[in-house]
Amino acid sequence: MKNVTDSFVSLGHWPSAGSFGFNTDILATNLINLSVVLGVLIFFGKGVLSDLLDNRKQRILNTIRNSEELREGAIEQLEKARARLRKVEIEADQFRVNGYSEIEREKLNLIDSTYKTLEQLENYKNETINFEQQKASNQVRQRVFQQALQGALGTLNSCLNSELHLRTISANIGILGAMKEITD
């Protein structure tokens, strides 16, 4: 390894005129070395660098294009979703309105049905009351009639004796005999 180091040191001491060698003076050779390195890099790296930049540019353009396509797709989906939302909102409003009107209609039908049922119950109640009143009146009449009949029979039985009975029978026989003579 010492030989390698010595060879580099001896290269630095060669005379610069008429031969190739390394100048180790940093201040004197830095710009030249840099320009040589840059020239070599530009000459050989130009194609590689332009290929890298072109590839990077293509990837960026493809990414932008894909992003634009995705954005357009997202905008289309958003518009479709908004249209569906508007349609669903309209249908919901219609269902709400129809539901409210249906509820009102059912409410009115229920109220009408309840009034009719109450009216029928009132009629049944009145008919039942009238029937019970007639039944009570008939029972009272029957009792009055039975009591009057029993009173009349009691009066007749107490007033009728056999002599009155015989006179009534002979008067009736006389009336029947007179009727027979008139008809003959």
Curated annotation (Swiss-Prot):
Task: Report the main location listed first in the record.
Answer: plastid
Transmembrane domains' residue ranges:
27-49
Q: How does it sit in the membrane?
A: Single-pass membrane protein
Recorded GO molecular functions are:
proton-transporting ATP synthase activity, rotational mechanism
Q: Does the keyword Transport apply?
A: yes
CDD domains associated with the record: ATP-synt_Fo_b
Under the heading InterPro entries, the entry gives: ATP_synth_b/b'su_bac/chlpt
Cellular component (GO) terms are: chloroplast thylakoid membrane; proton-transporting ATP synthase complex
- Coiled-coil intervals in this record? none
Print the keywords alphabetically: ATP synthesis, CF(0), Chloroplast, Hydrogen ion transport, Ion transport, Membrane, Plastid, Thylakoid, Transmembrane, Transmembrane helix, Transport
Per the entry, what this protein does is:
F(1)F(0) ATP synthase produces ATP from ADP in the presence of a proton or sodium gradient. F-type ATPases consist of two structural domains, F(1) containing the extramembraneous catalytic core and F(0) containing the membrane proton channel, linked together by a central stalk and a peripheral stalk. During catalysis, ATP synthesis in the catalytic domain of F(1) is coupled via a rotary mechanism of the central stalk subunits to proton translocation. Component of the F(0) channel, it forms part of the peripheral stalk, linking F(1) to F(0).
Misc remark = In plastids the F-type ATPase is also known as CF(1)CF(0).
Task: Describe the protein's quaternary organization and the partners it interacts with.
Answer: F-type ATPases have 2 components, F(1) - the catalytic core - and F(0) - the membrane proton channel. F(1) has five subunits: alpha(3), beta(3), gamma(1), delta(1), epsilon(1). F(0) has four main subunits: a(1), b(1), b'(1) and c(10-14). The alpha and beta chains form an alternating ring which encloses part of the gamma chain. F(1) is attached to F(0) by a central stalk formed by the gamma and epsilon chains, while a peripheral stalk is formed by the delta, b and b' chains.
Regarding protein family, the annotation reads: Belongs to the ATPase B chain family.
Official protein name in the record = ATP synthase subunit b, chloroplastic
| Lineage, top ranks | Eukaryota, Viridiplantae, Streptophyta, Embryophyta, Tracheophyta
Annotated gene:
atpF
